[in-house]
Amino acid sequence: MKLFIAGHQGMVGGALVRRFGGEREVVVVKRTRAELDLVNQAAVEAFFAQEKPDMAIIAAAKVGGIHANSTYPAEYLFDNLAIAANTIHSAYRHGVKRLLFLGSSCIYPKHAPQPMPEDCLLTGPLEPTNEAYAVAKITGLKLCQYYRRQFGVLFHSAMPTNLYGPGDNYHPQNSHVLPALVRRFDEARAAGLSEVGAWGSGSPRREFLHVDDLADACAFLLRLENPPDWINVGTGSEVTIRGLTETVAAVTGFKGRVTWDPAKPDGMPRKLMDVSRLTALGWRARINLREGLEKTYASYLAEKSAGKLRS
C-alpha cells in the first residue's frame, strides 16, 4: 500500500513517517517542499497522477505565531486553502481510497464550551489572531465532508489539541508555550541562573498531546471502517501552566526558582478538547506528560547538538 504523507518535514509529518515507516505492507511516499509545492495546483495534480497513492495524510500547513498570522492573514488563508483544496481534489481525481486531513483545535469558536465538543464547530466567532488559519482548516474539513457525501470517497479529518515532541519549533519568540519553556529552562540551567520569570498567575489550564500519540491515533482512525467526518484527538486531561512550568524545570534539571508576574496576561482560563467520541471508539493517548517531556527534552538536546534545532 502506498501512503503519501504531506508535510513529512514538520513535527507531525515526522512522527507519521516514524509510525508508518516500520510497517512492511506500507510504502511511505514523501516529497520535500522543494520537490513538490502543494500550493501549486498543477504540480500537485501531476504528482498524484504519477504516484497514484492508495492513501494520504495531509499534515502540511503554513504555520506561524500570532504576529505572523496577524500581519500576513491573506498569505496564511490562501496558502492553507490551496494546500487543502489541491491535495483533496487531486486525491479524489486519481483514486486515493482513503484520506485523513489534519486540522487544529483553533477551528472551534473562541468562546466554545469547555471541554470543546466536535459539534460546537461554526457556532460562534473564531479567535481573531489566527482566524485566517482556522478558516482554511475548517474549509479543508468541510471539503473532506462534502467529497465524502457527494462522491462516496472515505475522506475524513482529525483535530488534534496542542502538540509537542521531536522536531518542534524552539524559536524564542515564535514557538508555542511548551517548547519555549524547554528552551528557556535549558538555557537558564546552562547559564547557572538562580531565577526564571514567567508571565501571569500560572492558573490557566491547557492540554498537551505528544506527537507520537497523534501518529498512533491517525493509524487507528485509518483502520476504522466508518470513521466520523471529523473527530477530536487529545488526552482528555489538563495541566495548569504553573504545573507545566514546574515539570519542565524539573526535567531540564533547572534548580533555581520560578517567579510569576500576575500583571502579565494569562490568556484563556481553560482550553481542553472533548475526546469522548474517540475514547468510545477505543483509542486513548499512552504517553503521559512527564514521560513525553523527558522524551522531548532528550530530542531537543540531540537536535541542538547536531545543529538541527528548529529555531
Predicted regions and their residues:
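C-terminal substrate-binding subdomain of Rossmann-fold SDR/epimerase-dehydratase oxidoreductases
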Residues: A6-G7, M11, A15-R19, E187-S311
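Adenosine-cofactor binding site in Rossmann-like domains, unifying the SAM/SAH pocket
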Residues: G21-A46
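NAD(P)H-binding glycine-rich loop region in Rossmannoid oxidoreductase-like domains
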Residues: Q41-L81, R93
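Conserved catalytic Lys-bearing alpha helix of Rossmann-like short-chain dehydrogenase/reductases
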Residues: L81-T87, A136-C144, L178
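Glycine-rich "substrate-gating" loop/helix at the edge of Rossmann-like oxidoreductase active sites
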Residues: T129-Y133, T161-H176, G200-D212, T235-S237
